[in-house]
Design a protein with these regions (language model features):
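Conserved short histidine dyad/triad with adjacent acidic residue
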Residues: 50-67, 96, 106
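Short acidic-glycine-tyrosine-enriched beta hairpin
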Residues: 86-107
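Mature catalytic domains of secreted/periplasmic carbohydrate-active enzymes
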Residues: 9-10, 71, 125, 133
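Glycine- and acidic-residue-biased ligand/ion/polar-headgroup-sensing regions
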Residues: 57-60, 66-87
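A short, N-terminal "cap"/entry segment at the start of jelly-roll beta-barrel domains
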Residues: 2-48, 135-143
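Double-stranded beta-helix
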Residues: 91-94, 113-143
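Short beta-strand His + acidic residue motifs that chelate non-heme Fe in jelly-roll/DSBH
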Residues: 62-64, 82-83, 104, 109-115
Length: 143
């Protein structure tokens, strides 16, 4: 009996595992250059969990912005810099290396930068919405 239960659990786990995610060009709300893979859920939905993985080239920046929902991030590889506030200031950023975890509560103003190529996994509640402090920084308004 336990073998059939174990087999069922393994089959469920296989359906929920992502082995080699396909990276896609980033959405309209991020500056050009990043690649994004949706691992779980739908970050554009009006509710529900999502997990995405971002691959960022060296020097990639996301200007000061905020999200309406809490955001959790784990650095998979490379170095990911995070700063708080309304003005991008590299001297005030904290560097997170591989394996580092951080979270930002909703509406917290922040900015980020990759130091070397970085892969970051982000998990949160949908929708994943990026609200730029300076509307001129919003790439969706430039396309």
């Amino acid at each position: 009996m336990w073998q059939s239960s174990l087999h069922w659990a393994v089959e469920i786990a296989r359906r929920n595992l992502v082995v080699n995610e396909r990276l896609l060009p980033q959405g309209r709300s991020l500056p050009a250059g990043a690649q994004l893979a949706v691992l779980e859920g739908d970050p554009t939905a009006s509710s529900g969990d999502f997990t995405v993985r971002l691959k960022l080239p060296d020097g990639y920046r996301i200007p000061p912005h905020w999200h309406p929902n809490r955001e959790n991030a784990t650095v998979i590889s490379g170095n990911f810099k995070v700063g708080m506030g309304d003005t991008f200031d590299e001297s005030k950023m904290t560097t997170l290396g591989p394996g580092s975890f951080g979270y930002l509560d909703s509406s917290m103003h922040h900015y980020v930068m990759a130091s070397g190529e970085a892969v970051v996994q982000v998990h949160g509640m949908s929708p994943l919405q990026v609200n730029y402090i300076n509307p001129n920084d919003d790439p969706s308004k430039k396309r």
